Amino acid sequence: MEEEVAALVIDNGSGMCKAGFAGDDAPRAVFPSIVGRPRHHGIMIGMGQKDSYVGDEAQSKRGILTLRYPIEHGVVTNWDDMEKIWHHTFYNELRVAPEEHPVLLTEAPINPKSNREKMTQIVFETFNAPAFYVSIQAVLSLYASGRTTGIVLDSGDGVTHVVPIYEGFALPHAISRVDMAGRDLTDYLMKILAERGYTFSTTAEREIVRDIKEKLCYVALDFEQEIQTASQSSSLEKSYELPDGQVITIGNERFRAPEALFQPSVLGLESGGIHVTTFNSIMKCDVDVRKDLYGNIVMSGGTTMYPGISDRMQKEITALAPSSMKVKIIAPPERKYSVWIGGSILASLSTFQQMWISKQEYDESGPSIVHRKCF
């Protein structure tokens, strides 16, 4: 045992899978969490066609495939496809033998118990890993920011969670989940671009809209004011070149799409905005910890990457909080990957090494051991 074996860290998101080695400062592999199967069998004679494609390859061949996302709203719903994604991660992306490395996976807050057991079972029985651990995504984001107490707003492609954490433990009674995230904002942007006369309808065109969203959208500090500015001048307009060379211009759509985070009613959703959800989660916590939560509001996930989101959040929470309360929003520049980074930090700590569930423990106790060792 001269050479320390690096643990594998895999953060399975609804939209993207992030994977790499513990101790690294960024994931080595980032690819779409998609499994594609041919729509028609046997039309591609001589192509040596596979019965399924994963990630970027599925994305690039999407014309002939039916695409499925095995993770919906942050929770695994299709285990066969999930297994394919993990297989692809180990063998094609990281090029490692999973039976030689401890594996750390991430899970959504309030993940069903049966899901954690199934995950544990697949890692040990299908991939024969020597050791395994599962960690809550928001908690890892908090670790990545160098804290153990705070409230994490984690918003990715499929789901948004608000998770208050005290001394490293998530407070389950105060966790909120909102089924509104990046994918919904992309769909909404598609809808409001159609009102301008630009129609995007296929799944391939949806990817273009996602790119427009990532490159041009931002959050307005004062929505009404911004709408006024946009109607009076063209200073907020930007142009975007489509793959076919056509150039389109977008104006108030740039901030109208992300505004849905603060006003979900525009999507026809009942829930309050992310600021209200955060405030409500804080109010569900013990009065003694609230000050620590207000002072450590940590943003994480790709949907928190919009320019202007921290300032807007600061303004909205300050308006809701008691007047003397110090409100601080932490938005690390690498927050798109902070769940993965937190996992990398955790799995490389010397104090963490006795926390792993070993293959031996699994063989003795079965999948339910995960509830005793990972919390």
UniProtKB/Swiss-Prot annotation:
Q: What is this protein called?
A: Actin, gamma
**What compartments host this protein?**
Cytoplasm, Cytoskeleton
Predominant location? cytoplasm
Enzyme class, UniProt record, top EC level: hydrolase
Under SMART domains, the record lists:
ACTIN (SM00268)
Cross-referenced PANTHER family, in alphabetical order? ACTIN
| One cellular-component annotation, GO | hyphal tip
Annotated family: Belongs to the actin family.
| Keywords assigned by UniProt, alphabetized | ATP-binding, Cytoplasm, Cytoskeleton, Hydrolase, Nucleotide-binding
**CDD domains, A to Z:** ASKHA_NBD_actin (cd10224)
Q: Which organism is it from?
A: Emericella nidulans (strain FGSC A4 / ATCC 38163 / CBS 112.46 / NRRL 194 / M139) (Aspergillus nidulans)
Any Pfam family hit: Actin
What transmembrane ranges does the database entry give? none
**Primary role:** Actins are highly conserved proteins that are involved in various types of cell motility and are ubiquitously expressed in all eukaryotic cells.
> Which reaction is this enzyme known to catalyze?
ATP + H2O = ADP + phosphate + H(+)
Q: Name one GO molecular function term.
A: ATP binding
Write down the EC number: 3.6.4.-
